[in-house]
A protein has these predicted regions:
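Long, low-complexity, charged/polar intrinsically disordered regions in eukaryotic proteins
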Residues: 1-34
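Long, charge-rich, low-complexity alpha-helical segments
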Residues: 32-104
């Protein structure tokens, strides 16, 4: 995932919420219904996902997160997040194209 990979999140609905235990979360829902579940992320990870507009490399995303929160996420963590979003069809790319084709 290192290099010129520029993750591009699809338009999703996002809602702030409070999880059991009182922790703030952001709930993401796919309005196209390709990913039928909801995705719960902590606000910091949700911020990182919001930066995935297709214009930023993985390293750009890491630096954007660092500027916002003062912590540099590990490459492995970020690669895993991107892989997870991709596998769910939440990023524009090959998996989304396949899943969208199956839905038609």
């Amino acid at each position: 995932m290192i290099g010129e990979n520029r993750p591009h999140i699809r338009p999703l609905e996002a809602f702030p919420a409070v999880a059991q235990g009182g922790q703030p979360v952001v709930i993401f829902r796919d309005p196209l219904g390709i990913f039928r579940e909801t995705l719960l992320l902590n606000p910091q990870t949700a911020h990182l996902v919001a930066l995935m507009d297709g214009s930023r490399t993985i390293e750009d995303l890491r630096m954007g997160f660092f500027r916002a929160f003062g912590v540099l996420p590990g490459m492995g963590e970020l690669d895993q997040l991107v892989a997870d979003l991709e596998s769910k069809g939440l990023l524009f790319g090959q998996t989304f194209d396949i899943l969208a084709g199956e839905k038609v």
